Amino acid sequence: MAAASGSVLQRCIVSPAGRHSASLIFLHGSGDSGQGLRMWIKQVLNQDLTFQHIKIIYPTAPPRSYTPMKGGISNVWFDRFKITNDCPEHLESIDVMCQVLTDLIDEEVKSGIKKNRILIGGFSMGGCMAIHLAYRNHQDVAGVFALSSFLNKASAVYQALQKSNGVLPELFQCHGTADELVLHSWAEETNSMLKSLGVTTKFHSFPNVYHELSKTELDILKLWILTKLPGEMEKQK
């Protein structure tokens, strides 16, 4: 199934309150949408996630068949053979979406935002997609975040990093210890592997948090985003 190009990806945008000098691409989990993720975050925080200078882009994955749903159609960034960390990646669909999302990054660059002022991340499958996008294709972005996400054991990301000798973006990772869909141990293993391959990482565990977003997690994420994409006042300090 052909995927849409980045220029026609449906998206929900939260504009900065002031002058736009940085962009954040936040990718939803499987079966969700950009608007759905924005509203979920708003529900958890009791307000929109907003910044003075950062535009937030919540794109929606185009519908495609999804093997874990027995081939049913869902808004997913790529296909999986199954939801586990010990099977091969569906690299063909991942690579198609890397190109689609590269088009979205290119749009921001053409609008005047430098690559080192663009941050990429996501929840669950969205976090996995962000890791592939950044560490295999865009190692010059400001940073990467992955919430309740994991990579498969023989991920193409690990292979790409073995060949890399440049400066890599920092990874901010969060995971609930009570997550029964994406196990906390899978995320820990992902973090350890990336760290061993030269990625600077921050890993936050949240007791009694399932496969979900938490307010504490989002509050910490917001602070980290501001360290990676400071506004004019912060940069001058």
From Swiss-Prot:
Its EC number is 3.1.2.22. Keywords: Acetylation, Cytoplasm, Hydrolase. One of its GO terms (cellular component) is cytoplasm. The active site is at residues 124, 179, 211. One of its GO terms (molecular function) is hydrolase activity, acting on ester bonds. It is an enzyme of class 3 (hydrolase). The modification N-acetylalanine is found at residue 2. It catalyses: S-hexadecanoyl-L-cysteinyl-[protein] + H2O = L-cysteinyl-[protein] + hexadecanoate + H(+). One of its GO terms (biological process) is negative regulation of cGAS/STING signaling pathway. Palmitoyl thioesterase that catalyzes depalmitoylation of CGAS and KCNMA1. Acts as a regulator of innate immunity by mediating depalmitoylation of CGAS, thereby preventing CGAS homodimerization and cyclic GMP-AMP synthase activity. Does not exhibit phospholipase nor triacylglycerol lipase activity, able to hydrolyze only short chain substrates due to its shallow active site. Belongs to the AB hydrolase superfamily. AB hydrolase 2 family. This is Lysophospholipase-like protein 1. The gene is LYPLAL1.
